[in-house]
């Protein structure tokens, strides 16, 4: 009840009271800022952890950790931090400047309908999007099953034998197919045929990839190509970019006679109606699953696919999910054939792909699960029938259709009709068409197209709202009969998606429960911290994620006119400027759509720079032994020769060895690839000297930005001496890992390298003759998820970003300090401190207790934790990165788990516990192993299942026991097994 006495009696008094209350409200708002939501430890926690480390303040810690010569002494020039509400409102304003037209541009991108049950329960669900790549398969069976469904879907639709678990985009997949063909072809040719009917972005990405490898690209007509020059491979579009469906069998037979491999870039939805590539002789099929319920997003992210013959299984790029079994004989899934991946094969790898598009592959697979084979076919038939209607009506209006065999795309000759007149009418109807040339336009229909949309398109060409025809049943039936797809050689006769998983979950209730069952099999950030070194598994805040699903960002075609994408342009300009400020670089490209692609792009820019100066001989890339495996793989892709540089006993680059190698290769030195802080988790004091050595020999310094979470606001790559740096936005800038993608890997470059940044054939900016060409299918890569990083920077501001870096370093040092008495910290920087991660040395445990690194990783699952990075960068170690988002309580739980495990090992060392039959060797423990049959082990069920107090409050149960990796590789299966195999 309000007392009258409390009401101000004068206007002055009222004014002062209102002012005070407003100030109070502002103070409350400040207390509720996003920075405190993002950073896990409270102020009291931070002080307590500093006390443990013996420091009075965070600044004191940073002063002792980061070399003074490289520290940034000025605040970053970034916008002031905004609340979540204010940031969302500001971004909504920007989004409103995008215009959502009906886009019938095609070229591999189509509007689609994301089933609400998939959007809400996968795309918007942190249980799916905050997980990591399934390197610990026992706690990743859910998304591994979803990815196996994806692979099965692709195998069935393409008619090939094996498929991987996604690639970055269709153009990149085509480039990977070219590289694989080059590697396995035995005819020694170095020319690759590219059909001129491929999408322009595919052709451009292939040209970019081919140039440094010395591959000659021959662009031509497959119908007239006479094979006068030997080729090792070819790529064909199916259907062609202009919509035409060709019979490619004769071309493929002739190619095979030469020993060449043929890749078909195929639209997977069309394959529900068309003869699959595998059935007419294709060796490889690639494409995009974007139209399987994944929003356009102005170019991405989308899951590409890659399918081929089983004989090439060890040459396939990217990850493959395979079927194996666990220790109890139960069917279990894992990543198969991992020894072919870049992090193991390094410079011998044929691909540098690491992060792919797992989250989007899961969505696409569930789209197929939800609709089933009949549902997909109905969608495809409906699109095709509407395209037939459109074609007939346009012909009746006097226009010429260039092809009589098509699925969803038409090209129309305008005749005497001016192109500008068509475009102005289309704009009035808020419709986008593909401009092929001054007298030709293209139209691609999609799942969202209605008959009324078709009428609107016809009104554009008729020049009037009144159409001279009506569609009745008889007319419709007659038009459908005109389809060439019902006849050989185009009509698909083989069945597909016959596995029960594609025929069981067609009601929303059933799919919802299936998705939830899979989700609960996986450990994500919704369960506990994921302390993977070099992975930065920080908070992916809900406010950062929400805009991804806004229509203003999601329904924009990547080749829509720039006049319709003002909002995106503002977003890009701001983000490029902020990332440039954070890194100290003059220019930024947002096109690379993964960290691996950022590396590749950065090195291509360096290569192009040297060539522009007439120094084509510069092709040696120095890489420390400790580098990420993608580094040497990327260098080889850029036509460079890798020369390894040694590390000293402290884990730092051996500067004497670096100087010797730089001197030896001075004439041909192109670049040094260096990670900072180092992959050993320390700030190397000699980093500026290292950069100076390379520059003195005419080389450029490429800095791997994987560890940028320890630099933001404290030091900058450009100031340190780097010429190029890629950023993992899915690490430092909060884009979630998605269980193995999406990622984004933009690069920052010094001013002298700006002219060489990527271009794109569909944009005016792509016509700069100095640029390296396109490295991704879309001009700004996976544009729609850039809103996540934009939101993070806006809500954190300069102070918040810097504080996050400091706390990330604090958390890592706190863990190192707490665990040092139990596990030696392998490398430390100056003053005995680590950067944002630390390496714990477990090598002695093999000798003392017969304990392998894997035993500790699997036992951590029983405690409810994902293992840190295992056996990298040093075999027999674990690398821990807690990030700034984890609270002190969570750090303490993790430390207590590792300390308890060390005690279990001590019991083995003391002979109290059997060296073979113990809680580590048998980990992880499933519910079934605990309750079914006799308990044969010398330790209790309680110790197995509830080794720590918090596991009684909330227990994460692995769905399978330890998986037999070797069995899965010996008995390679990468598609769904019969359902009884899971029982």
Swiss-Prot record:
This protein's UniProt keywords: Oxidoreductase, Pyridoxal phosphate
Cofactor: pyridoxal 5'-phosphate
One example GO MF annotation: glycine binding
Nuclease keyword on record: no
Domain of life of the native organism: Bacteria
Modified residues annotated as N6-(pyridoxal phosphate)lysine in this record: 731
One Pfam family this sequence matches: GcvP2_C
Coiled-coil features, chain-numbered ranges: none
EC number annotated for this UniProt entry: 1.4.4.2
Enzyme category, top tier: oxidoreductase
Reactions that this protein is recorded to catalyse: N(6)-[(R)-lipoyl]-L-lysyl-[glycine-cleavage complex H protein] + glycine + H(+) = N(6)-[(R)-S(8)-aminomethyldihydrolipoyl]-L-lysyl-[glycine-cleavage complex H protein] + CO2
GO cellular component entries: cytosol; glycine cleavage complex
Statement: the UniProt record of this protein carries the keyword Chaperone: no
Gene Ontology biological process terms from the UniProt entry: glycine decarboxylation via glycine cleavage system
Protein family according to the UniProt entry: Belongs to the GcvP family.
Known partners and oligomeric status: The glycine cleavage system is composed of four proteins: P, T, L and H.
Protein purpose: The glycine cleavage system catalyzes the degradation of glycine. The P protein binds the alpha-amino group of glycine through its pyridoxal phosphate cofactor; CO(2) is released and the remaining methylamine moiety is then transferred to the lipoamide cofactor of the H protein.
UniProt protein name: Glycine dehydrogenase (decarboxylating)
Organism: Nostoc sp. (strain PCC 7120 / SAG 25.82 / UTEX 2576)
Gene giving rise to this polypeptide: gcvP
């Amino acid at each position: 009840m309000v007392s009258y006495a409390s009401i101000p009696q004068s206007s002055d008094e009222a004014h002062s009271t209102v002012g005070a209350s407003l100030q109070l409200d502002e103070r409350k708002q400040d207390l509720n800022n996003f920075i405190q939501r993002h950073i896990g430890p409270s102020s009291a926690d931070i002080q307590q952890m500093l006390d443990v480390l013996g420091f009075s303040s965070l600044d004191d810690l940073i002063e002792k950790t980061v070399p003074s010569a490289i520290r940034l002494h000025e605040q970053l020039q970034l916008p002031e931090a905004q609340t979540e509400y204010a940031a969302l409102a500001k971004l909504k304003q920007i989004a409103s400047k995008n215009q959502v037209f009906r886009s019938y541009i095609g070229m591999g991108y189509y509007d689609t309908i994301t089933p609400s049950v998939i959007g809400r329960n996968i795309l918007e669900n942190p249980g799916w999007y905050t997980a990591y790549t399934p390197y610990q398969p026992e706690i990743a069976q859910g998304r591994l099953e979803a990815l196996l469904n994806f692979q099965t879907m692709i195998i069935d639709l393409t008619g090939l034998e094996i498929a991987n678990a996604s690639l970055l985009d269709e153009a990149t997949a085509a480039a990977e197919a070219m590289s694989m063909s080059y590697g396995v072809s035995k005819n020694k040719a170095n020319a690759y045929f590219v059909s001129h009917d491929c999408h322009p972005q595919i052709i451009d990405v292939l040209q970019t990839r081919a140039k440094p490898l010395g591959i000659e690209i021959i662009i031509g007509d497959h119908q007239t190509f006479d094979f006068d020059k030997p080729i090792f491979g070819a790529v064909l579009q199916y259907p062609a970019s202009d919509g035409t469906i060709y019979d490619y069998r004769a071309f493929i037979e002739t190619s095979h006679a030469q020993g060449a491999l043929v890749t078909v870039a195929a639209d997977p939805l069309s394959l529900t109606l068309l003869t699959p590539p595998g059935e007419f002789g294709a060796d490889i099929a690639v494409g995009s699953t974007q139209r399987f319920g994944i929003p356009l997003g102005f170019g991405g992210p989308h899951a590409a696919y890659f399918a081929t013959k089983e004989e090439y299984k060890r040459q396939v790029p990217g990850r493959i999910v395979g079927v194996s079994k666990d220790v109890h004989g139960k069917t279990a899934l894992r990543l198969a054939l991992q020894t072919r991946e870049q992090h193991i094969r390094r410079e011998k790898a044929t691909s540098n792909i690491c992060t792919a598009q797992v989250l989007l592959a899961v969505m696409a697979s569930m789209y197929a699960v939800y609709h089933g084979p009949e549902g997909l076919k109905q969608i495809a038939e409906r699109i095709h029938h509407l395209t037939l209607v459109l074609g007939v009506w346009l012909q009746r209006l006097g226009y010429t259709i260039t092809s009589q065999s098509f699925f969803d795309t038409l090209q129309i000759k305008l005749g005497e009709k001016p192109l500008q007149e068509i475009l102005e009418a289309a704009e009035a109807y808020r419709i986008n068409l593909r401009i092929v040339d001054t007298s030709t336009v293209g139209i691609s229909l999609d799942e969202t197209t209605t008959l009324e949309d078709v009428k609107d398109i016809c009104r554009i060409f008729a020049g009037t709202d009144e159409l001279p025809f009506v569609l009745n049943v008889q007319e419709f039936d007659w038009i459908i009969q005109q389809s060439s797809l019902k006849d050989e050689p185009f009509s698909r006769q083989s069945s597909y998606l016959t596995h029960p998983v594609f025929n069981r979950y067609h009601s929303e209730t059933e799919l919802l429960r299936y998705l939830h069952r899979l989700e609960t099999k996986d450990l994500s950030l919704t369960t506990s911290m994921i302390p993977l070194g070099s992975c930065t598994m920080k908070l992916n805040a809900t406010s950062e994620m929400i805009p991804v699903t806004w229509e203003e960002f999601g329904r924009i075609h990547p080749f829509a006119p720039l006049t319709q994408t003002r909002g995106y342009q503002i977003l890009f300009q701001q983000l490029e400027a902020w990332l440039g400020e954070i890194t100290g670089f003059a220019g930024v490209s947002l096109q690379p759509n993964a960290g691996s692609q950022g590396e590749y792009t950065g090195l291509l820019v360096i290569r192009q720079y040297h060539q522009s100066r007439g120094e084509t001989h510069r092709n040696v890339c120095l890489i420390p032994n400790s580098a990420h495996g993608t580094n040497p793989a990327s260098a080889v892709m850029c036509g460079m020769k890798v020369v390894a540089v040694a590390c000293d006993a402290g884990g730092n680059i051996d500067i004497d060895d670096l100087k010797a190698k730089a001197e030896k290769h001075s004439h041909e030195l192109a670049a040094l690839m260096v990670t900072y802080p180092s992959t050993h988790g320390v700030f190397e004091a000699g980093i500026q000297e290292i950069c100076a050595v390379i520059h003195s020999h005419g080389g450029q310094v490429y800095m791997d930005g994987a560890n940028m979470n320890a630099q933001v606001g404290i030091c900058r790559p450009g100031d340190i001496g780097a010429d190029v740096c890629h950023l993992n936005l899915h690490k430092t800038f909060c884009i979630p890992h998605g269980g193995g993608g999406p990622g984004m890997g933009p690069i920052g470059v010094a001013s002298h390298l700006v002219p060489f940044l990527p271009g794109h054939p569909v944009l005016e900016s792509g016509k700069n003759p100095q640029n390296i060409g396109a490295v991704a299918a879309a001009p700004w890569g996976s544009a729609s998820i850039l809103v996540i990083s934009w939101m993070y920077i806006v809500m954190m501001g300069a102070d918040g970003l810097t504080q996050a870096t400091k706390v990330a370093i604090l958390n890592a040092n706190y863990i190192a300090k707490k665990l040092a008495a139990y596990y030696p910290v392998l490398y430390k920087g100056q003053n005995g401190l680590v950067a944002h991660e630390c390496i714990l040395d477990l090598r002695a445990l093999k000798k003392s207790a017969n304990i392998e690194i894997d035993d500790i990783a699997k036992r951590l699952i029983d405690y409810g934790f994902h293992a840190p990075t295992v056996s990298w960068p040093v075999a027999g170690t674990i690398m821990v990165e807690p990030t700034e988002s984890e609270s002190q309580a969570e750090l303490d739980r993790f430390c207590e788990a590792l300390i308890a495990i060390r005690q279990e090992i001590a019991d083995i060392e003391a002979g109290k516990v059997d060296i073979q039959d113990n809680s580590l060797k048998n980990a992880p423990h499933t519910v079934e192993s605990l309750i079914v049959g006799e308990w044969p082990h010398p330790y209790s069920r309680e110790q197995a299942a509830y080794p720590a107090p918090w596991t009684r409050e909330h227990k994460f149960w692995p769905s399978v026991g330890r998986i037999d990796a070797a069995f899965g590789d010996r008995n390679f299966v990468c598609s769904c097994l019969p359902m009884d195999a899971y029982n």
